[in-house]
């Protein structure tokens, strides 16, 4: 479980970024959303110790992040940054994914097993000898996820994972997140994309001006007037509301509910 207890964060200039943050995330897929500058990335960087609270505590499975280094917390909370290109430096995909497990001091047999498993999880089997730099945007994003998965953290943070992806890349990302969820990975997703939230999230945490404005099930989140938070309501939700239908995530579910 990830727990924030009265967490505050501010910079040296006195600007408050997070104010009295309290919530518990027990597992599944959590989307963290909100306007630009609301504190989303600051919040998730506290989960693996990249930032420490100025006040309050972040507890991950009973471990206070104040008491551990970033390296120690990264074994528990994996972090995939917004721009995956910055992560890549090896000559091929296999070596890229193997780097993390090797740093853990694992045997080559275990390293290879983890690499094959991680690539399979993200749909990149057969890419082992490819250069990371020649992959498409969607493939690079999935490779970045595989690199973290191979370390086998319990929690996986994806910071704006769909930035720069075309429709095909986005569909591939959605499929990967769904598969990870089915395989019992716990995912924390930072995004502005409400379509992505609708497709994959179990719970949503909404930030504005450094404060939590909503935390709860995704179906309750989409009952809010998202215009108040500079967020765009998905067309599927608009249609469902106009027709007074139950909560639906996508076109396929909408068709089933309507009975077409």
Curated annotation (Swiss-Prot):
GO cellular component: ATP-binding cassette (ABC) transporter complex
GO biological process: cobalt ion transport
Location of the protein in the cell: Cell membrane
A GO MF label: ATP binding
SUPFAM superfamilies, A to Z: P-loop containing nucleoside triphosphate hydrolases (SSF52540)
Ribosomal protein found in the keyword field: no
Superkingdom classification of source: Archaea
Alphabetical keyword list: ATP-binding, Cell membrane, Membrane, Nucleotide-binding, Translocase, Transport
Membrane topology: Peripheral membrane protein
InterPro entries found in the cross-reference section: AAA+_ATPase, ABC_transporter-like_ATP-bd, ABC_transporter-like_CS, ABC_transpr_CbiO/EcfA_su, Co_trans_ATP-bd, ECF_ABC_transporter_ATP-bd, P-loop_NTPase
Domain ABC transporter: start-end pairs: 2-234
EC number: 7.-.-.-
SMART domains: AAA (SM00382)
PROSITE patterns to which the protein is assigned, alphabetical: ABC_TRANSPORTER_1, ABC_TRANSPORTER_2
Gene3D superfamilies for the chain: P-loop containing nucleotide triphosphate hydrolases (3.40.50.300)
Residues involved in ATP binding: 34-41
Stated family: Belongs to the ABC transporter superfamily.
Function, in words: Probably part of an ABC transporter complex. Responsible for energy coupling to the transport system.
Entry-linked PANTHER family: ABC-TYPE COBALT TRANSPORT SYSTEM, ATPASE COMPONENT (PTHR43553:SF25), HEAVY METAL TRANSPORTER (PTHR43553)
NCBIfam families from the UniProt entry: cbiO
Name used for this protein in its record: Putative ABC transporter ATP-binding protein PYRAB01300
Lineage summary: Archaea, Methanobacteriati, Methanobacteriota, Thermococci, Thermococcales
């Amino acid at each position: 479980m990830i727990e924030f207890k009265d967490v505050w964060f501010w910079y040296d200039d006195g600007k408050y970024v997070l104010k009295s943050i309290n919530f518990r995330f027990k597992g599944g897929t959590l989307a963290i959303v909100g306007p630009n500058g609301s504190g989303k990335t600051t919040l998730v960087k506290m989960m693996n110790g990249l930032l420490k609270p100025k006040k309050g505590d972040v507890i991950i499975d009973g471990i206070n992040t104040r008491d551990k280094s970033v390296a120690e917390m990264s074994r528990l909370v994996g972090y995939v940054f917004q721009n995956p290109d910055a992560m890549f430096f090896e000559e091929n995909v296999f070596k890229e994914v193997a780097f993390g497990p090797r740093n853990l001091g694992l045997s080559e047999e275990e390293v290879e097993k983890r690499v094959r498993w991680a690539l399979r999880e993200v749909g990149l089997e057969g890419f082992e000898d490819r250069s990371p730099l020649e992959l498409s945007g969607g493939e690079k994003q999935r490779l970045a996820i595989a690199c973290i998965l191979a370390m086998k953290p319990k929690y996986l943070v994806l910071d704006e994972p769909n930035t720069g992806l075309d429709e095909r890349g986005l569909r591939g990302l959605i499929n990967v997140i769904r598969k990870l969820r089915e395989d019992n990975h716990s995912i924390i997703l930072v995004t502005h994309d409400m379509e992505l939230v609708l497709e994959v999230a179990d719970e949503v945490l909404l930030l504005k001006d450094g404060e939590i404005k909503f935390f709860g099930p995704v179906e309750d989140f989409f009952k809010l007037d998202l215009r108040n938070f500079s967020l765009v309501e998905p067309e599927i939700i608009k249609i469902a509301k106009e027709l007074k239908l139950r909560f639906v995530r996508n076109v396929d579910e909408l068709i089933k509910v309507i009975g077409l």
